Amino acid sequence: MKKRILPLVLALLLAASLTGCAGRTVSGEPYKMYMIVKSTTTEFWKSVFAGANAAKSEYNVDLTVLGPETEEDYEAQNEYIRQAIRDGADAIVFSAISYTKNAQAINDAASAGIKVVVIDSDVNSDGVVARIGTDNVQAGRMCAKAALETNLESIVVGIVNCDVETQNGQEREQGFRAGLSGDARVQEIYTV
């Protein structure tokens, strides 16, 4: 289901992010859009790229897709944002590695007149014009509910949060912890 809806969401995302860039439409020049994500190798991001590539022709978009080699390299993302600013991008579609450490670069892009749309993983910036993502607190609660569907009398929980720098990682853990909090069987919660 997610793979079928994603191209539609990305087409809408492209249209929304380019609102206000009418000057390029009149001249026939393509919109310059950068898609800067957390990774270019996972199946999730490959499906996002497929949707963006499907929509770019319809919306006359010159699309540059960039992402670091690891999902921890927020500085590479910041450099890609600076590259988009230097290149005169009209819009950036962005998924933050760090909610806080990517904020200044996004603020700089917005100050340069670039429309910024966040997908999947948010950034602490007022310069973002649209956000598309999951209700991560609710997703965490749903995971907790599934984890509690056991007949065990005592439960010790270990949380491995590999996205602790991202807002979505923090919110998922928050929702998971909240979902566990009402069950007396939960004895201890460890986070690594």
Stretches found by the model and what they are:
Residues 21-192:
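A residue-level marker of the well-folded mature domains of exported/periplasmic proteins
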Residues 4-23:
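Sec-dependent N-terminal signal peptides of Gram-positive bacterial secreted proteins and lipoproteins
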